[in-house]
Amino acid sequence: MNENLENFSTIDLLNELKRRYACLSKPDGRYIFLGAPGSGKGTQSLNLKKSHCYCHLSTGDLLREAAEKKTELGLKIKNIINEGKLVDDQMVLSLVDEKLKTPQCKKGFILDGYPRNVKQAEDLNKLLQKNQTKLDGVFYFNVPDEVLVNRISGRLIHKPSGRIYHKIFNPPKVPFRDDVTNEPLIQREDDNEDVLKKRLTVFKSETSPLISYYKNKNLLINLDATQPANDLEKKISQHIDG
């Protein structure tokens, strides 16, 4: 038996098999989640990953992983992220391409935080064509700026799983502890009001044209992302499942 599997109880393994079996009845899908930081993309991506067995590709997570390697490039990426700026297009595309080729992405994927601009969207389209596949839809998470600031400034994250909490709107059962593992939660260095305002400025100037780009391709699905997370999850599933 694989040593990794020995770390899990039989009940946990059976529940995981049951979840994956249920995914077989769900449609394959390739989607982009488009929205500003704090719009709810990450939470809904994890929900869809669990219910449909799609792989969740967050370029933010990919870049943070690179930043933590303490290499010269990693330190450069870390500084760029903390300043609220964007990383080189070609490097991000290479990271995405590498992940899309993994077995976890065979049933489908959710691109969270990529593409950020029309040039990246065109590069992604070429990459998907090369891999003989295409997008099924682009969900746009629409949230006013003032709501985004409130959400981000109180965000807490369980790094190993990606579970997201909020100090006020979705607090953990035990302060600063993950509900499932009881491991400590963190607040990202770039989750503060000053950095967020810079990120929102960048988002509006670089990313907003994507709304028109994908609308013209009849791929855009506009969501009111101020509604409760459970209601938003149902809306997304309705679009995907038909």
Swiss-Prot record:
Signal peptide: none annotated. Residues 154-191 are annotated as: LID. AMP binds at T59, R64, K85, L86, V87, G113, Y114, P115, R116, Q120, R199. It is found in: Cytoplasm. Gene3D superfamilies: 6.10.250.2370, P-loop containing nucleotide triphosphate hydrolases (3.40.50.300). InterPro entries: Adenyl_kin_sub (IPR006259), Adenylat/UMP-CMP_kin (IPR000850), Adenylat_kinase_CS (IPR033690), Adenylate_kinase_lid-dom (IPR007862), P-loop_NTPase (IPR027417). ATP binds at G38, S39, G40, K41, G42, T43, R155, Y165, A229. Inhibited by the dinucleoside pentaphosphate compound P1,P5-di(adenosine-5') pentaphosphate (AP5A). GO terms for molecular function: adenylate kinase activity; ATP binding. GO terms for biological process: generation of precursor metabolites and energy. Its EC number is 2.7.4.3. Residues 58-87 are annotated as: NMP. It catalyses: AMP + ATP = 2 ADP. Keywords: ATP-binding, Cytoplasm, Kinase, Nucleotide-binding, Transferase. Its main location: cytoplasm. One of its GO terms (cellular component) is mitochondrion. It holds the Pfam family ADK_lid. Optimum pH is 5.5. PROSITE patterns: ADENYLATE_KINASE. Belongs to the adenylate kinase family. Catalyzes the reversible transfer of the terminal phosphate group between ATP and AMP. Has very low activity with CTP, GTP, ITP and UTP and no activity with GMP, CMP, UMP or IMP in vitro. This is Adenylate kinase 1. It comes from Plasmodium falciparum (isolate 3D7). The gene is AK1.
